[in-house]
Amino acid sequence: MDGSGTGSRSGVESILPNYKLGRTLGIGSFGRVKIAEHALTGHKVAIKILNRRKIKNMEMEEKVRREIKILRLFMHPHIIRLYEVIETPTDIYLVMEYVNSGELFDYIVEKGRLQEDEARNFFQQIISGVEYCHRNMVVHRDLKPENLLLDSKCNVKIADFGLSNIMRDGHFLKTSCGSPNYAAPEVISGKLYAGPEVDVWSCGVILYALLCGTLPFDDENIPNLFKKIKGGIYTLPSHLSPGARDLIPRMLVVDPMKRVTIPEIRQHPWFQAHLPRYLAVPPPDTVQQAKKIDEEILQEVINMGFDRNHLIESLRNRTQNDGTVTYYLILDNRFRASSGYLGAEFQETMEGTPRMHPAESVASPVSHRLPGLMEYQGVGLRSQYPVERKWALGLQSRAHPREIMTEVLKALQDLNVCWKKIGHYNMKCRWVPNSSADGMLSNSMHDNNYFGDESSIIENEAAVKSPNVVKFEIQLYKTRDDKYLLDLQRVQGPQFLFLDLCAAFLAQLRVL
């Protein structure tokens, strides 16, 4: 027990009656972490106690809420588990998985560069966890050894989702965040990015650190560091195996559109070597996991006094209560203790459901096989590699971007749509049905005007306040096969009006 006062201790224990609190594991900027024991099962947990006032003073409410939202969703052997959230007017209590072997960062500092098999084992676990995030439309954006925790068996647990973002179809992120040494060039440059590819870059930096004991991009001078990252300037030590020397450069490609994807990493010969059975297939999504209930553990929880029907309904609906917390604590600790480390759960999914092809993973923005990957060292993967997609987001064209944008502006003018330029190939738009062109806008359609610094828009206040106003964004981006994709995303307004507008917009275009 720590030295906190009896009054505060009894207060906390009244809020957490199902746990026996132990010592303080650490103290942070807006809270502390205590070890605790779940009363019914005896399993250890870590309880984060976050002070609401400190969170608000540090303007960290959004970061904390984001992490809670994401961790509540996730069930994966290599992502830290959140079992329960208890809120009071003064504090937020997060009951989380307890891991006791520190950070991967400290492990690397202590051991230096790792043997290839050990590094590969860590990397396989990291990629599995990151792939699970992407399948659930979450980009971590701050992957680094400091955010990778180790349990007693040296299994990786991805933590700290405070900087993560939920991905939305057709929407691009532009928030620069994360640690500079691990951040992708497009992130530190403030460019638009779809998400998954920035995690791939960070994983490449982590793999380099595991195998080399140093960082590929490092400089005390931040401008020099950014210059190295933007230029992709680093050296590969001679001790690396041919497989590692092939994979790392594929991950540390400056152009995100040419960077290897998670499905392609999975199929790389170096990654495939000694791949554990439970990591050999993509993990089930959260919906599949909620439907699958372990009958033996269910009965064990029922024997503790919980109602069977209520427990099953709560598990299927992912409802947090004493019964479901008890169930998941037993489930996780049982599989963790087994030699397969959750292998049984993943194997059951593999055998009980159709195998999802790696190409179905979230990839950014359009997934295609990289040329040369299958020819590496003469290894023929045949049907294992991701098949090229038959579909893509948005409207495709091989026309020049300037020509495309000029036609877009002409179509917007014909449809009486207001637009505001955000970047050369990104704009915000507003449309009100049955509004005249004179009342809505006065746009110059000369292409030099669009590619200049001005946004050509003059609006009518009455039109802006219309209940039928439709707001949307237009984004043009380049694909790997030298085509261009034009994507429209509704931001606000009636869905059917937006679809009508899209149909009319498509009919107006001459280059797509």
From Swiss-Prot:
Active site feature: 142 (proton acceptor)
Cross-link (Glycyl lysine isopeptide (Lys-Gly) (interchain with G-Cter in ubiquitin)): 20
Knockout consequences: Anthocyanin accumulation and accelerated senescence. Starch accumulation during phosphate deficiency. Reduced sensitivity to glucose during early development. Increased seed abortion. Blocked autophagy during abiotic stresses but not under control conditions. Enhanced sucrose-induced hypocotyl elongation.
Post-translational modification, as annotated: Phosphorylated at Thr-175 in response to glucose. Phosphorylated at Thr-175 under submergence. Autophosphorylated. Dephosphorylated at Thr-175 by ABI1 and PP2CA. Ubiquitinated. Degradation is mediated by a CUL4-based E3 ligase that uses PRL1 as a substrate receptor.
UniProt-listed InterPro entries: KA1/Ssp2_C (IPR028375), KA1_dom (IPR001772), Kinase-like_dom_sf (IPR011009), Prot_kinase_dom (IPR000719), Protein_kinase_ATP_BS (IPR017441), Ser/Thr_kinase_AS (IPR008271), UBA (IPR015940), UBA-like_sf (IPR009060)
Residue segments, region PPI: 390-512
Auto-inhibitory domain (AID), as annotated region: 290-389
Function (record text): Catalytic subunit of the probable trimeric SNF1-related protein kinase (SnRK) complex, a central regulator of cellular energy homeostasis, which, in response to seemingly unrelated darkness, sugar and stress conditions, activates energy-producing pathways and inhibits energy-consuming processes. May play a role in a signal transduction cascade regulating gene expression and carbohydrate metabolism in higher plants.
Other information: Overexpressing plants show delayed leaf senescence, enhanced tolerance to nutrient starvation dependent on a functional autophagy pathway, enhanced formation of autophagosomes, and tolerance to drought and submergence. Overexpression of KIN10 leads to increased autophagy. Overexpression inhibits sucrose-induced hypocotyl elongation.
Recorded domain comment: The regulatory domain (RD) contains the auto-inhibitory domain (AID) that inhibits kinase activity of the protein kinase domain (KD). The PPI motif mediates the interaction with the ABI (abscisic acid-insensitive) phosphatases.
Name the record gives this protein: SNF1-related protein kinase catalytic subunit alpha KIN10
Source organism of this protein record: Arabidopsis thaliana (Mouse-ear cress)
